[in-house]
């Protein structure tokens, strides 16, 4: 009887110990940037996505609101947090300033067509900025629609999903309706998420 009890205890202990070891070996994501910097970028991405959704839905009110919030978020980016790497810091300043300039232009336009032209430039410069700083909070897709402008010129945007949710043709296009909502595909993928394979 004692032998059976010892055998059961041994099996239970080994199983529990294996589970602990498996948990310790589970990969975790480690950012190369400070928490302050990452936290200051979170509202930038959130408001950019909200603006993208506004364009998808042909909702200029939502676009305008998100653009104003994005402007506020951009002004609050703690860019000096990456100043220790001079090359990255100096290279990031140009795209960051360009985003602000293009966003101001977008907010000043009266038609959604013109706003989309500025949105395209905002997206291009945001992509350049995130690629320069090696944004590592999430995986991003730089999407491209080949017929965003007049059915012949491309337009780009950033997305967390690989599937296209097209902000240029959207759900209420005068010619296509919502049939071209999925038009587009990733032109590039930003994935700088670092993985530490040993959890301490």
Which role fits each region the language model picked out?
Residues 1-200:
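Intrinsically disordered, low-complexity terminal tails/loops enriched in metal-binding residues
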């Amino acid at each position: 009887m004692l032998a059976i009890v010892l055998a059961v205890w041994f099996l239970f202990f080994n199983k529990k110990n294996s589970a602990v070891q498996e948990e310790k070996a589970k990969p975790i994501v480690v950012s190369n940037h400070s928490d302050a910097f990452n936290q200051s970028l979170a509202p930038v991405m959130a408001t950019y996505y909200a603006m993208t959704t506004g364009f998808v839905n042909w909702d200029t009110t939502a676009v305008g609101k998100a653009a104003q919030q994005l402007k506020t978020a951009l002004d609050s980016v703690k860019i000096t947090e990456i100043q220790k790497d001079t090359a990255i810091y100096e290279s990031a300043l140009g795209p960051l300033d360009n985003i602000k300039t293009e966003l101001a232009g977008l907010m000043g336009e009266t038609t959604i067509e013109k706003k989309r032209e500025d949105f395209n430039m905002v997206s291009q410069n945001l992509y350049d900025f995130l690629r320069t700083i090696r944004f590592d909070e999430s995986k991003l897709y730089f999407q491209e629609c080949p017929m965003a402008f007049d059915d012949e010129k491309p337009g780009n945007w950033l997305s967390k999903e690989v599937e296209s949710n097209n902000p240029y043709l959207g759900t209420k296009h005068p010619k296509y309706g919502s049939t071209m909502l999925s038009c587009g595909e990733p032109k590039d993928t930003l994935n700088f998420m670092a993985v530490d394979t040993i959890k301490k």
